[in-house]
Amino acid sequence: MADRGDAARRLDHAAARHLSGAFGLSRAALQRLVAEGRVRVNGVAASRPAQRLQAGDAVDLDLPPPPPRPAPSAERLPLEILYEDDALLVVCKPPGLVAHPSYAHKTGTLLNALLWHAGDRHAGEPSWQPRLVQRLDKDTSGLLVAAKSADVQTALQSARAGFMKEYLAVVWGRPVPARGTIDLRLGRDPLDRRRVMARDGGAAAVTQYHVLARSRGDARGLSLVRCELVTGRTHQLRVHLAARGWPIVGDQAYGEAPRARLAAVALDRRARAFGRQALHAWRLRFTHPRSERVLQFDAPLPADMAALVAAAGMERALPQVAVS
């Protein structure tokens, strides 16, 4: 369904806007679909890609079945493993590494590295298939669990596993109160399906937060925040913090820096130039599906985020393990 943002747009532009992320469809591919009679507007076959839409127009696409996606290949990539047994692994993902192959990132992912690890350890064909239990955004660093079998993956994703995930974030502003709960429903942005927004009727999403420190000498400044996910929605922390007026430093999608500059000029420049969202999954706790032991893992901040925290004079407030 065309929305207000599609009014007067070309058909191919509007369709690409909604479908490029989810289906990997380019404008050229959409133009071919129009030429093949596979696109209908309000029940009538579209005559040309440049046809203009109106808000409320119903657009139907008859998509051909996608070609089978090749199985991810093993790649020798750096891999930081904190724990491994015959059922699972716990790894620390660096910033900039995609967790799972996608249309945009077919190689060079964490899963490719895990496949190499499986084969390398077992001399040839892997005897187990890594299955990521949860994911992190490309530019979010920190802890992830990979199961070695489907039954372990299912068990870890059940409520019995009791997953607890904590993050450290550097945000713009001074969260008030210093400790609290953010309870905002989240859903896809109707104008950009790649984004998430707080909206009525969305999925329940709850975040608990605690301000650990504030940067020195500025009424606005930066804050170091510890967050626990009660639920695990896509982009939950990024959207929740931004919705409260405390966007994460470096977040290109949700974290636009405030126009007002910080009094500390060097810190302001460093924060505005930070190349990714300053978000790190630092603690993970869960019940092992076989031994039923409660396992907890901590990961120190990566160097870029640790330097930002230190520049803001907040390093003493870090949980002890988060200091390299």
Give the location of each predicted region.
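Structural motif
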Residues: 57-58, 233, 293
